[in-house]
Amino acid sequence: PPPRGAAGAFPGRRCFIRINMEKPTDTAIRPLHETELPAASALAGRVFAEFEAPEYSPEGIGAFLRFAAPETLAAQHRNGSMQSWGAFRQGTLIGIITLTRRSHLCLLFVEKACHRQGIARALFSALRDHCRTAPDTPRITVNSSPYAVEAYRRLGFRATGGERTVDGIRFTPMEYLFI
């Protein structure tokens, strides 16, 4: 009789196909070093330009680029007001997530070629696990761009208000509650 399990047989033939149903585990998530912040800034800028900037005013684009500039990120990391994690594949940075104010997610970007591969979820999982260890942190907040609202919903966030615009940046305030 033909073997059973992950291998399948074509009726009447002794031909088998082995299917690997597991997702590759070649992505490493770890805290970013200050020397990696320029690459993180560049990644955020590329992804923002393609997916979010078309919906923003010039004022909003400028505000984002100033916030995500390498020198701004480095200054905030140095003074302890920001922490960032990166997703790496074969040593290449493919995604970033950033935390401010102990529980506010402010940057989550994944290279276009790596979308829908669980990278954002893995980055959020690292950030969430970090926040769970902090005292008096009942939730994680985010100001989601219009493009990312549905992705944040899939991660377990819920909107806490309607869309707003501040300094040209369009966003929906959302939160993730630790239950």
Where do the language-model regions lie?
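Acetyl-CoA-dependent GNAT
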Residues: 31-34, 42-112, 124-126, 130, ...
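Conserved N-terminal entry element of GNAT/NAT acetyltransferase domains
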Residues: 13-38
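Conserved active-site alpha-helix within GNAT-family acetyltransferase domains
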Residues: 121, 146-162, 166-170
